[in-house]
Amino acid sequence: CTQQYEYHYDPKSDDEITLKAKANHRDSSQAARVGTNVHNALEHWRKPDADGKTGKLTFDRLMEYYEKENSISEVDFQFYEDGERMLTRWFDRRGRQPVRIIDTERGFGTHRSPYKLSNGTPVFGFIDAILEHRDGTIELLDYKTQRADITQAEADNSIQAGIYLAVAREWWPEKKIKFSFDLLRYGVVSTTWSDEKIDSFKDWLKTQYEWISKIEKGNPTIGDGCKWCAFADLCPKAQELMQKGAWDLLDPTMGEDLDEMLTELATIKASKQMLDRRQRSIDAHLKNNVFD
């Protein structure tokens, strides 16, 4: 969303500056804080030393890092427990697997000094963990503590995956590479792209960069992240949805009551049938009375 980008990186009004500061306040970012604490604990736990070796990867050691992170960036008890449960589940399922860790939290460029792909497109970010498997495959991991799951189709078409794979292909041109969303609440969703797909993505990304570079004013785009956007109170699109009573349609379904979801689904289906009938009626009227 170019509007959110403008609000965040180039706030102009007092309201924009205030909302940006509010988003960073502890009471507004408990879920984000526990996510960061979980990420940091995994990063330090897996971090190799100068010789490329890691310490003993035990659960107790992982929890020591988690507790240390919470002493630096504290969260309420319920969020602390949520992070603890995620790490426990993650360790039982994936933490015991032997794997060579190349690096953790490896950066490529910054907002002010981005990494430039071979076609000149600037990108920046951090790769949570880089692993090397026995067959030589390089795996790029991105930890996710979000409540929404990620489908295989979403991973196969992820812009984040594309950027990371494009960078990794330039770092390891002869290696097999894959990207994985490591969803701490669910499991791992991996995607492998051919060199042709990576090259095509880089070409597309360059067109997006050139388009964004020409934008003089942000344009709001409605999407899944709107419910958590700090600037919804200023966003004209969000305000329009609120006034029409459609804002709640952006709510995710994860964790909702099953009966409520079934009731909502029945309502949606009934409404869809009525709208379909209305559409057919209008189409017939226009065909018989206007276009004949």
Regions found by a protein language model. Give the residues of each.
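Metal-dependent nuclease catalytic regions and adjoining charged, substrate-binding loops involved
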Residues: 70, 119, 151-156, 165-270, ...
